[in-house]
């Protein structure tokens, strides 16, 4: 799928948990933010009167299922499709989506035609319609065709500053203009960019952007919640960490070096202890080296450590590996791969991300010698939609031992190359939720394959095949 059909990337579809890796480099220094001087005492630059502030509104009311084929019912693809992702609730023609953005601190003397509006919205029914967007009651962008399940990602530039007729708030309304009362659309996100003063609304963290300036910048920020502690300005472009000057009451001042970067990104963070997250523990992580031949196999078993014990100390997952390595089981070089390890290495630590499996299988196909012949997943899986909407339930982890791909769920896509829908290596799954179920399956598999491989053609040995 094209990344252009992704709506907004503010919220993850897979999990609400973030993992951070602090790496050790034995041959050099890792990247660090460099403490940088803030020479306000000798400043000769005038204070910047405004910056172009972007206020974003992201919606997380529902997981929109995206493009559907309407054949008596709505049928969806397991691949991530147009319009799939977090959105607002469905919006019907009678009642558009309205949002008031407060505390905008508009700079009234700013450039007169420099307001930008962006919107990402999607149709949610098989009806013709146009997308209609209004700022302070004034339509912007004209009537934008968005029929059926089509997606629109629009940027409307050079709007007049006068459209923001209040210095303190912006009213936005978004709707579809279908004549059918039951029509539906959904909005993923929108934003408004406009000239604003350096009033940071008593926030403890404030992200902002500046354009290039070959002379440098002098910033005088007001109404920032520093609680009497010098805040820290992070310069993302330059990798700098600058301590704010709070010697003047009610102000945080910075002198920034000249820059030719077209767009510079900053984040002002309060240094107050109440604004810090305490890390109570760290766990050591040494990645498994899958380039090592000893860690490669041609029968890949992907499972969850929870299934490695049936409650009596028996690891039926490993017994299954032993069976597949035996003559009766096919004489494979069977290996068990821990889903937690794959999440960390191939899913960038993102729990439940399908890339953990898909990218590992791609890697195995390209690097293992010999290449894998089969992939067998041991452990139940849930579609991302079912897991995400229920991840606060303790049972969700028990029912989602090894993640699958998309909604509706598809293990085949875990084994498919990007942009394809056929497996690069045969793949299957045992949807077990405990080690005992793995043992029961293993016993049945042994019996089945023993009978299957038997050369006997007697009625006594083949009668079971007539039992339906």
What does each model-found stretch correspond to?
Residues 1-468:
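Cysteine-dependent hydrolase recognition
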């Amino acid at each position: 799928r094209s990344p252009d059909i992704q709506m907004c990337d503010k919220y993850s579809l897979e999990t609400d948990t973030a993992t951070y890796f602090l790496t050790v480099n034995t041959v050099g220094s890792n990247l660090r933010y460099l403490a940088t001087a803030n020479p306000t005492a000798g400043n000769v630059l005038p204070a910047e009167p405004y910056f172009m502030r972007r206020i974003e509104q992201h919606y997380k009311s529902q997981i929109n299922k995206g493009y559907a084929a309407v054949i008596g019912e709505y049928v969806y693809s397991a691949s991530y499709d147009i319009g799939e992702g977090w959105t607002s609730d469905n919006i019907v023609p009678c009642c558009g989506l309205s949002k008031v953005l407060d505390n905008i601190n508009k700079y009234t003397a700013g450039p007169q035609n420099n307001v930008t509006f962006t919107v990402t919205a999607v149709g949610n029914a098989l009806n013709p319609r146009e997308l209609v967007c209004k700022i302070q009651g004034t339509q912007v962008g004209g009537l934008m065709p968005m029929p059926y399940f089509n997606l629109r990602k629009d940027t409307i530039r050079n709007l007049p500053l006068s459209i923001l007729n209040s210095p303190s708030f912006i009213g936005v309304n978004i709707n579809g203009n279908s004549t059918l009362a039951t029509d539906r659309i959904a909005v993923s996100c929108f934003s408004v960019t406009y000239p604003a003063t350096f009033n940071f609304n008593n926030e403890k963290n404030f992200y902002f952007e500046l354009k290039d300036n070959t002379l440098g910048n002098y910033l005088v920020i007001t109404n920032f919640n520093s609680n009497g502690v010098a805040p820290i300005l992070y310069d993302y472009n330059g990798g700098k960490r600058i301590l704010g000057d709070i010697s003047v009451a009610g102000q945080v001042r910075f002198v920034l070096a000249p820059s030719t970067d077209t767009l510079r990104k900053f984040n002002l963070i309060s240094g107050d202890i109440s604004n810090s997250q305490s890390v109570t523990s760290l766990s050591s992580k040494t990645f498994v080296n899958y380039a090592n031949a000893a860690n490669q196999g041609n029968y890949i078993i992907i499972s969850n450590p929870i299934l490695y014990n049936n409650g009596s100390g028996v690891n039926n997952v490993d017994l299954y590996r032993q069976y597949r390595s035996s003559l009766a089981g096919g004489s494979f070089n069977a290996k068990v791969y821990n889903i937690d390890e794959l999440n960390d290495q191939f899913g960038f630590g993102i729990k439940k991300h399908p890339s953990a499996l898909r990218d590992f299988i791609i890697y195995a196909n390209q690097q293992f010698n010999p290449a894998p012949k089969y992939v067998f997943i041991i452990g139940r899986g849930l579609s991302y939609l079912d897991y995400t909407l229920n991840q606060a339930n303790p049972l969700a982890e028990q029912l989602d031992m090894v993640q699958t791909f998309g909604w509706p769920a598809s293990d085949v896509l875990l084994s498919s190359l990007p942009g394809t829908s056929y497996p690069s290596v045969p793949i299957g799954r045992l949807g077990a939720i405990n080690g005992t179920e793995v043992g029961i399956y293993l016993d049945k598999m042994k019996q089945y394959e023993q009978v299957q491989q038997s050369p006997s053609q007697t009625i006594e040995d083949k009668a079971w095949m007539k039992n339906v």
